[in-house]
Amino acid sequence: MLDKARLRIAMQKSGRLSDDSRALLARCGIKINLNQQRLIAYAENMPIDILRVRDDDIPGLVMDGVVDLGIIGENVLEEELLKRRAQGENPSYITLRRLDFGACRLSLAAPVDFDYQGVECLNNTRIATSYPNLLKRYLDQKGITFKSCLLNGSVEVAPRAGLADSICDLVSTGATLEANGLKEVEVIYRSKACLIQRDGEMDATKQALIDRLMTRIQGVIQARESKYIMLHAPSDCLEDVIALLPGAERPTILPLAGDQNRVAMHMVSSETLFWETMEKLKALGASSILVLPIEKMME
């Protein structure tokens, strides 16, 4: 039984976003015993309940106010939104932020021997998909008439099984398409995981907890996207060194014992540091260059 005084968060029980969602909560310091058999898990150190459900149930649970927050792929969220609007409903929710995992794309794919010259080639054909509403919106915008073959899994086998001429499915690497004799021909939607909140009045205590959680999530994502950089550099090259690190805050400059011509620099950079950048730093006279991951970060 759920305690309505506790913050309720829905997340995928198993699948593409499950592990990353659990890792995000753990890095936010939320201690949860996620036993594989339990559909409801309780945080040990915060008044939070986790509902572990199918991913396509999460948007509805948030829109209907059953849970307070949901971690869901934008593709699933948008599909549910379009479905409800087509049924005459006016669903609402609040997107709190995009997350830094779950990147994928919803694409049209056709058999490798199909002579694809553009989306017009799909006019009056049969397309298998688990996302009929996203597919319809895209092809309606292109003026394409098609027949939809709704499948809830194994969409990629539809052309080989004679169920459809082509498919519209999620693609991450394209390996599954290739294994089934298909080629990606058109990207119709790009998606990442996102955190959403139910619309409507929220208890002040719950809202304060959501604000705390958002601060932690922001810190976790910022830490993953940032690096702590330490190096020694000539005093007369400081601005050139800083210019190679766009996104970095102004560095901390420390004197080096016994060397008046060089200093130690410490800084946080939000940019990916490639080997080429490190080589350029070295060419400017920098040495002892260390690039370290950041576990937690708060501005």
Curated annotation (Swiss-Prot):
Keyword set for this entry? Amino-acid biosynthesis, ATP-binding, Cytoplasm, Glycosyltransferase, Histidine biosynthesis, Magnesium, Metal-binding, Nucleotide-binding, Transferase
Which InterPro entries does the record cross-reference, listed alphabetically? ATP-PRT_HisG_long (IPR020621), ATP_PRibTrfase_cat (IPR013820), ATP_PRibTrfase_CS (IPR018198), ATP_PRibTrfase_HisG (IPR001348), HisG_C (IPR013115), N-reg_PII-like_a/b (IPR011322), N-reg_PII/ATP_PRibTrfase_C (IPR015867)
Query: Keyword Lyase, does the record have it?
Result: no
Activity regulation information from UniProt: Feedback inhibited by histidine.
User: Which one GO biological process term can you cite for this protein?
Assistant: L-histidine biosynthetic process
Cofactors that this protein relies on: Mg(2+)
Localization of this protein: Cytoplasm
Going by the record, the broad EC class of this enzyme is transferase
Q: Which residues form a coiled coil?
A: none
One Pfam entry name: HisG
Q: Which domain of life is it from?
A: Bacteria
Question: Main subcellular localization, coarse class?
Answer: cytoplasm
State any single GO MF term.
magnesium ion binding
Pathway connected to this protein: Amino-acid biosynthesis; L-histidine biosynthesis; L-histidine from 5-phospho-alpha-D-ribose 1-diphosphate: step 1/9
What is the reaction catalyzed? 1-(5-phospho-beta-D-ribosyl)-ATP + diphosphate = 5-phospho-alpha-D-ribose 1-diphosphate + ATP
NCBIfam families to which the protein is assigned, alphabetical: hisG (TIGR00070), HisG_C-term (TIGR03455)
Family to which the UniProt record says this protein belongs = Belongs to the ATP phosphoribosyltransferase family. Long subfamily.
Binding partners and assembly: Equilibrium between an active dimeric form, an inactive hexameric form and higher aggregates. Interconversion between the various forms is largely reversible and is influenced by the natural substrates and inhibitors of the enzyme.
Protein's UniProt name:
ATP phosphoribosyltransferase
